[in-house]
């Protein structure tokens, strides 16, 4: 049986009640050569049972993995990647959604450019009909530009499709809230070419209480862990770029924590 072009990995934890819109837009994708891998992270509600029911009635090619223990989104994504059969990996958070032509446009850009990674802009949706388009950084074409891009590149796995082989011998770190920040520069480093679609194709739902917006005194520590992971994963020739990125991460983590404390 022919392997799909894309494997879409979706970590889930007590999230079934937020998933209807994302599943709807998966079923409406104009490019259909893909599989969906749900990774249930030991949900304590009926999410796993609902996923099994959905698998039986859905038109999508679906596989479901259940973690042995609660491991967080990074490890859940790693399990999904290990099970993936697609040439490229895409990620979707359980409460977010794609534009209907997300995969079609990503595939077209891959074919056109031969890139290892394609990424796009995204919408930040606030759940009340309001949304904001977030633009991304330009891509690199030369080595010196690649260095700058590692320092400045986007932080989201979900707005990207990534050649599956780039994940060989590297795993997403088990860092709550900052695993994307740690992982994207490494994937860019390992890539031969990155391409960019200047169009918002992903919807990120801003939901108070979700993992990425929850109040936590561990935020700054998460970014410190992300920086340490980066510093140990990329050669010294990129030391300046990683230090620059690390300073950004640490400052963001500190300011984020201060703002959250002020809101309590």
What are these regions (language model features)?
Residues 99, 104-174:
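Flexible acidic/His/Gly-enriched loops in nucleotide-sugar-dependent glycosyltransferase catalytic domains
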Residues 89:
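Short aromatic/hydrophobic "clamp" motif used to bind/position activated sugar donors
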Residues 1, 205-264:
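C-terminal subregions of glycosyltransferases and related glycan-biosynthesis enzymes
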Residues 67-84:
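Glycine-rich, basic loop-to-helix element that forms the pyrophosphate-binding segment
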Residues 144-218, 222-223:
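Conserved nucleotide-sugar donor-binding catalytic segment
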